Amino acid sequence: MPRPKILKRATVQPSAAVPVKKSTPEKEGSRQKKTNGKENASRNLQSNLEEDLEQLGFEDETVSMAQSAIENYFMQGKSASERMNNAKSRRGRRAGNGNTEEIEEDDEISNAITDFTKCDLPGLRNYITKKDNTEFEKRLEHLADNDFGKWKLYLAAGFNILLHGVGSKRDVLTEFENELSDYTYMRVDARKDGLNVKVLLGAINENMKLNCNVKRGQSTISWARSIRRKMNSQQLILIIDNIEAPDWRSDQEAFCELLENRDSVKLIATVDHIYSTFIWNSRQLSSLSFVHITINTFEIPLQELMTGDSRLLGLDARSNQSSHTMSSLDVFWKSLAVNSQKLFRLFFQMYFDTKKPVKFWDLFNAAKDDFIASTDAALRTQLVEFKDHRVLKWTRGDDGNDQLSGIVELRLVTEFLESKNMPLDEKKDE
């Protein structure tokens, strides 16, 4: 057997040596110092980075824990409602399978969620009204002694004042009214139902006796311009709470037109929303000439809460009592059949007599006695229409049965039914 050939590695001929540049001892020392400096800097950077990472990790953990706690508190209504809707959908799918145990379990979950998301609004109101305000009264007195004079100077110089900050500022404006007792002023609550820029223009025209009524087909901007021209020889100070209210956002151009004459119409207003200034563009902000003043009262905004859209308090748009007026109820009434109109009166009679949610089967028995509905299915059909028009809302009681709560205030319902010759019966004293 022939021996395999062993291949030898080729040797490379050494090339000509490249002469190495010799450095002086001074350069060697400086180079070594630079190297040591870089190593020290890298060590310091690494140690600082490790410390920052440790602190960052601790801060992130703290922030995440705080955020989760805040979200669990303030977002509980939303998450609970979503879970309740999911439970209802599961209950509907399982009803066809006849699985009664799962249905009962879902009912218990929905009942627990409903109880968890309930908010005792009367109790909340009583707590806020009984709160000790001595500290706030001292701050308000200090504000009146030191700042109210400056505010009047701002108004006299042709500027408008915009108050913002944490807490309700209604009492601040109420106290400032005392400083304006020698002037002509008008206080407006922009959150009040039915109040907007057009209503404000009508009130100015009537109270200032301008005789500048709106013409047929005249725009709000043109009407505001006419009122401004009529007020050349008069002066008015507008005090507006929550000028960023939804009904005021669309007519800000007309409002700016009214304030164009700074010698005649002056403004001091409050805002609460963090993005409230976005309702004005840059040109409008320039014409309004706001002096922004921060006032942190830290007072609970009771009126703002009750007229707002807080889902946590159950005052969202679907249950807000200020969402109905006489005209809206009249339109809804005309769309109802005669039996549905009788049911409307019967439900609110039972609801306002007991001042508690009306159980569905109690309402059905009463409706059956009055020949309004012969079956529970017919009654549910009528009540669904009431719910769609935000007249009542469905909840589930402690016993698992459906119950109904009215979301239109007593004064409005009483006045409306009297106009329809179907007044509510007065509750007899026991």
From Swiss-Prot:
Keyword Kinase: no
Molecular function GO labels: DNA replication origin binding
One Pfam family hit: WHD_ORC2
Positions of region (Disordered): 1-49, 80-105
Biased composition (Basic and acidic residues): 23-41
Ranges in a coiled coil: none
Task performed by this protein: Component of the origin recognition complex (ORC) that binds origins of replication. DNA-binding is ATP-dependent, however specific DNA sequences that define origins of replication have not been identified so far. ORC is required to assemble the pre-replication complex necessary to initiate DNA replication.
Subunit structure: ORC is composed of six subunits.
Family: Belongs to the ORC2 family.
UniProt-recorded name of the protein: Origin recognition complex subunit 2
Originating organism: Caenorhabditis elegans
